[in-house]
Amino acid sequence: VYPEGFSIVDARMILGEPIRHPRAEDLSEKRLASLKAIFDAKSVAVVGASRPGSIGGIILKNSSRLEKLYPINPKRDKLMGLPCYPNLRAVPESVDVAVFAVPPHDTIRGFKEFCECGGKGALIVSDGYAEIGRPDLEDQLKAIADRHGVVYIGHNGLGVFDNFTGFNTLFLPMIRSQLPSRSGPIGIISQSGGIGLELLEMAAEDNLPIGTWVSVGNASGISIPELFVHMGRDDRIRSSRCAWRGFATACSS
Protein backbone atom coordinates (compact mmCIF):
# COMPACT_ATOMS: atom_id res chain seq x y z
CA VAL A 1 0.00 0.00 0.00
CA TYR A 2 1.34 3.40 -1.00
CA PRO A 3 0.15 6.92 -0.06
CA GLU A 4 -1.12 7.36 -3.63
CA GLY A 5 -2.79 3.97 -3.82
CA PHE A 6 -1.93 0.30 -3.84
CA SER A 7 -0.57 -2.43 -6.12
CA ILE A 8 -1.82 -5.96 -6.57
CA VAL A 9 0.56 -8.74 -7.52
CA ASP A 10 -0.75 -12.06 -8.79
CA ALA A 11 1.81 -14.87 -8.64
CA ARG A 12 1.98 -18.62 -8.26
CA MET A 13 4.57 -20.16 -5.95
CA ILE A 14 5.48 -23.84 -6.20
CA LEU A 15 7.00 -25.19 -3.00
CA GLY A 16 9.41 -28.08 -3.05
CA GLU A 17 12.88 -28.92 -4.33
CA PRO A 18 14.56 -26.15 -6.32
CA ILE A 19 14.37 -26.53 -10.08
CA ARG A 20 17.57 -27.90 -11.54
CA HIS A 21 18.00 -27.07 -15.20
CA PRO A 22 19.12 -30.03 -17.32
CA ARG A 23 22.62 -30.11 -18.71
CA ALA A 24 23.82 -31.99 -21.78
CA GLU A 25 25.88 -34.36 -19.62
CA ASP A 26 22.72 -35.36 -17.71
CA LEU A 27 21.21 -36.95 -20.79
CA SER A 28 21.67 -40.57 -21.76
CA GLU A 29 24.06 -41.14 -24.66
CA LYS A 30 22.14 -44.28 -25.57
CA ARG A 31 18.89 -42.34 -25.91
CA LEU A 32 20.58 -39.59 -27.90
CA ALA A 33 22.07 -42.20 -30.27
CA SER A 34 18.60 -43.65 -30.80
CA LEU A 35 17.23 -40.16 -31.47
CA LYS A 36 20.03 -39.41 -33.94
CA ALA A 37 19.14 -42.58 -35.85
CA ILE A 38 15.69 -41.14 -36.61
CA PHE A 39 17.27 -38.24 -38.48
CA ASP A 40 19.84 -40.46 -40.21
CA ALA A 41 17.30 -43.09 -41.26
CA LYS A 42 18.35 -45.25 -44.19
CA SER A 43 15.21 -47.41 -44.09
CA VAL A 44 11.74 -46.53 -42.81
CA ALA A 45 8.62 -48.63 -42.23
CA VAL A 46 5.16 -47.04 -42.09
CA VAL A 47 2.98 -49.20 -39.85
CA GLY A 48 -0.59 -48.49 -40.84
CA ALA A 49 0.15 -47.42 -44.41
CA SER A 50 -3.13 -47.57 -46.27
CA ARG A 51 -5.26 -46.03 -49.01
CA PRO A 52 -4.49 -42.55 -50.39
CA GLY A 53 -5.92 -39.87 -48.11
CA SER A 54 -5.61 -41.91 -44.90
CA ILE A 55 -3.09 -40.87 -42.25
CA GLY A 56 -0.78 -43.78 -43.03
CA GLY A 57 -1.25 -43.28 -46.77
CA ILE A 58 -0.33 -39.59 -46.60
CA ILE A 59 2.78 -40.32 -44.50
CA LEU A 60 3.84 -42.96 -47.04
CA LYS A 61 3.39 -40.54 -49.94
CA ASN A 62 5.10 -37.63 -48.18
CA SER A 63 8.16 -39.78 -47.40
CA SER A 64 8.48 -41.15 -50.94
CA ARG A 65 11.87 -39.42 -51.38
CA LEU A 66 13.40 -42.01 -49.05
CA GLU A 67 15.36 -44.75 -50.78
CA LYS A 68 14.06 -47.62 -48.63
CA LEU A 69 10.41 -47.31 -47.63
CA TYR A 70 8.32 -50.23 -46.38
CA PRO A 71 4.51 -50.09 -46.02
CA ILE A 72 3.20 -52.39 -43.27
CA ASN A 73 -0.38 -53.53 -43.87
CA PRO A 74 -1.51 -57.18 -43.70
CA LYS A 75 -4.56 -56.44 -45.87
CA ARG A 76 -2.74 -54.97 -48.87
CA ASP A 77 -0.36 -56.44 -51.44
CA LYS A 78 0.96 -53.13 -52.74
CA LEU A 79 0.73 -49.41 -52.02
CA MET A 80 2.18 -46.72 -54.29
CA GLY A 81 3.86 -49.49 -56.24
CA LEU A 82 5.67 -50.73 -53.12
CA PRO A 83 5.18 -54.27 -51.78
CA CYS A 84 3.33 -54.36 -48.46
CA TYR A 85 4.40 -56.54 -45.55
CA PRO A 86 2.07 -58.05 -42.95
CA ASN A 87 4.34 -57.08 -40.04
CA LEU A 88 7.81 -55.78 -39.29
CA ARG A 89 9.31 -59.25 -38.97
CA ALA A 90 8.42 -59.92 -42.61
CA VAL A 91 10.52 -57.01 -43.92
CA PRO A 92 13.62 -58.44 -45.65
CA GLU A 93 16.07 -56.20 -43.78
CA SER A 94 16.41 -54.58 -40.39
CA VAL A 95 14.46 -51.31 -40.43
CA ASP A 96 16.09 -48.24 -38.87
CA VAL A 97 12.93 -46.28 -38.12
CA ALA A 98 9.24 -47.13 -37.83
CA VAL A 99 6.31 -44.72 -37.96
CA PHE A 100 3.20 -45.95 -36.14
CA ALA A 101 -0.14 -44.67 -37.46
CA VAL A 102 -2.32 -47.33 -35.84
CA PRO A 103 -4.41 -47.52 -32.62
CA PRO A 104 -2.65 -47.86 -29.23
CA HIS A 105 -2.87 -51.65 -28.78
CA ASP A 106 -1.53 -52.24 -32.31
CA THR A 107 1.18 -49.64 -31.71
CA ILE A 108 2.33 -51.30 -28.48
CA ARG A 109 2.48 -54.71 -30.14
CA GLY A 110 4.25 -53.31 -33.23
CA PHE A 111 6.71 -51.21 -31.23
CA LYS A 112 7.74 -54.25 -29.20
CA GLU A 113 8.25 -56.22 -32.42
CA PHE A 114 10.22 -53.34 -33.93
CA CYS A 115 12.58 -53.16 -30.95
CA GLU A 116 13.08 -56.94 -30.94
CA CYS A 117 13.98 -56.79 -34.65
CA GLY A 118 16.80 -54.31 -34.04
CA GLY A 119 14.96 -51.06 -34.75
CA LYS A 120 16.76 -47.86 -33.78
CA GLY A 121 14.12 -45.16 -33.30
CA ALA A 122 10.39 -44.64 -33.82
CA LEU A 123 7.64 -42.07 -34.25
CA ILE A 124 4.15 -42.50 -32.84
CA VAL A 125 1.60 -40.12 -34.34
CA SER A 126 -1.55 -41.73 -32.95
CA ASP A 127 -3.30 -40.72 -29.72
CA GLY A 128 -5.36 -42.62 -27.14
CA TYR A 129 -3.04 -42.86 -24.14
CA ALA A 130 -2.81 -40.90 -20.87
CA GLU A 131 -4.52 -37.89 -22.45
CA ILE A 132 -7.80 -39.86 -22.56
CA GLY A 133 -7.35 -41.62 -19.23
CA ARG A 134 -5.21 -44.60 -20.30
CA PRO A 135 -1.83 -43.98 -18.64
CA ASP A 136 -1.38 -47.76 -18.48
CA LEU A 137 -0.98 -47.91 -22.26
CA GLU A 138 1.54 -45.08 -22.19
CA ASP A 139 3.45 -46.88 -19.42
CA GLN A 140 3.65 -49.99 -21.60
CA LEU A 141 5.24 -47.99 -24.41
CA LYS A 142 7.75 -46.41 -22.04
CA ALA A 143 8.64 -49.79 -20.52
CA ILE A 144 9.38 -51.25 -23.97
CA ALA A 145 11.44 -48.19 -24.90
CA ASP A 146 13.45 -48.35 -21.66
CA ARG A 147 14.02 -52.09 -21.91
CA HIS A 148 15.45 -51.88 -25.43
CA GLY A 149 17.02 -48.42 -25.30
CA VAL A 150 14.94 -47.24 -28.25
CA VAL A 151 13.28 -43.81 -28.11
CA TYR A 152 10.18 -42.66 -29.91
CA ILE A 153 9.01 -39.17 -30.87
CA GLY A 154 5.41 -38.62 -29.79
CA HIS A 155 2.92 -39.77 -29.10
CA ASN A 156 0.02 -37.68 -30.44
CA GLY A 157 2.17 -35.44 -32.64
CA LEU A 158 2.85 -34.75 -36.30
CA GLY A 159 6.35 -36.23 -36.09
CA VAL A 160 9.16 -34.88 -38.25
CA PHE A 161 9.83 -32.94 -41.41
CA ASP A 162 13.47 -33.41 -42.35
CA ASN A 163 14.64 -31.46 -45.39
CA PHE A 164 18.04 -33.14 -45.39
CA THR A 165 16.75 -36.67 -45.99
CA GLY A 166 13.18 -36.21 -47.24
CA PHE A 167 11.70 -37.95 -44.20
CA ASN A 168 8.26 -36.39 -43.72
CA THR A 169 5.60 -37.78 -41.38
CA LEU A 170 3.24 -34.82 -41.66
CA PHE A 171 -0.10 -36.45 -42.37
CA LEU A 172 -1.39 -33.45 -44.28
CA PRO A 173 -1.78 -33.46 -48.07
CA MET A 174 0.86 -31.26 -49.69
CA ILE A 175 -1.89 -29.27 -51.41
CA ARG A 176 -2.95 -28.03 -47.96
CA SER A 177 0.47 -27.01 -46.71
CA GLN A 178 3.29 -24.93 -48.09
CA LEU A 179 6.54 -26.41 -46.83
CA PRO A 180 10.09 -25.01 -47.02
CA SER A 181 11.87 -26.19 -50.15
CA ARG A 182 15.37 -25.18 -49.02
CA SER A 183 17.26 -27.20 -46.45
CA GLY A 184 19.50 -25.24 -44.14
CA PRO A 185 20.75 -24.52 -40.63
CA ILE A 186 17.45 -23.81 -38.84
CA GLY A 187 15.76 -26.38 -36.59
CA ILE A 188 12.27 -26.08 -35.09
CA ILE A 189 10.83 -27.99 -32.11
CA SER A 190 7.16 -27.68 -31.22
CA GLN A 191 4.84 -29.45 -28.80
CA SER A 192 1.76 -28.30 -30.66
CA GLY A 193 1.43 -29.68 -34.17
CA GLY A 194 -0.77 -26.76 -35.19
CA ILE A 195 1.60 -24.05 -33.95
CA GLY A 196 4.58 -25.96 -35.33
CA LEU A 197 2.92 -26.24 -38.73
CA GLU A 198 2.16 -22.52 -38.69
CA LEU A 199 5.85 -21.80 -38.03
CA LEU A 200 6.81 -24.15 -40.86
CA GLU A 201 4.45 -22.45 -43.31
CA MET A 202 5.69 -19.00 -42.26
CA ALA A 203 9.26 -20.16 -42.88
CA ALA A 204 8.25 -21.40 -46.33
CA GLU A 205 6.59 -18.07 -47.14
CA ASP A 206 9.77 -16.22 -46.13
CA ASN A 207 11.93 -18.75 -48.00
CA LEU A 208 13.89 -19.63 -44.86
CA PRO A 209 16.20 -22.67 -45.02
CA ILE A 210 14.68 -25.19 -42.59
CA GLY A 211 16.72 -28.32 -41.95
CA THR A 212 14.74 -30.19 -39.30
CA TRP A 213 11.27 -29.69 -37.82
CA VAL A 214 9.88 -31.81 -34.97
CA SER A 215 6.44 -32.01 -33.36
CA VAL A 216 6.75 -33.92 -30.07
CA GLY A 217 3.05 -33.99 -29.17
CA ASN A 218 2.67 -35.40 -25.66
CA ALA A 219 6.45 -35.98 -25.47
CA SER A 220 6.08 -39.28 -23.65
CA GLY A 221 8.99 -40.84 -25.53
CA ILE A 222 11.59 -38.09 -25.83
CA SER A 223 11.98 -34.74 -24.08
CA ILE A 224 12.46 -31.27 -25.53
CA PRO A 225 15.85 -30.85 -23.75
CA GLU A 226 17.04 -34.04 -25.47
CA LEU A 227 15.95 -32.69 -28.85
CA PHE A 228 17.82 -29.45 -28.15
CA VAL A 229 20.96 -31.42 -27.33
CA HIS A 230 20.55 -33.47 -30.52
CA MET A 231 20.22 -30.36 -32.68
CA GLY A 232 23.15 -28.76 -30.87
CA ARG A 233 25.31 -31.72 -31.88
CA ASP A 234 24.11 -31.69 -35.50
CA ASP A 235 26.69 -29.73 -37.51
CA ARG A 236 24.02 -28.92 -40.09
CA ILE A 237 21.87 -27.04 -37.53
CA ARG A 238 23.13 -23.68 -36.25
CA SER A 239 19.94 -22.17 -34.86
CA SER A 240 17.13 -23.96 -32.98
CA ARG A 241 13.68 -22.52 -32.22
CA CYS A 242 11.13 -23.98 -29.82
CA ALA A 243 7.43 -23.49 -29.07
CA TRP A 244 6.15 -25.35 -26.00
CA ARG A 245 3.23 -25.38 -23.58
CA GLY A 246 5.01 -26.87 -20.57
CA PHE A 247 7.33 -29.60 -19.33
CA ALA A 248 6.15 -32.69 -17.47
CA THR A 249 9.77 -33.37 -16.44
CA ALA A 250 12.94 -31.43 -17.03
CA CYS A 251 14.73 -34.25 -18.80
CA SER A 252 15.02 -38.00 -19.12
CA SER A 253 18.04 -40.04 -18.19
PLM region descriptions:
Residues 1-253:
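Catalytic-core regions of core metabolic enzymes
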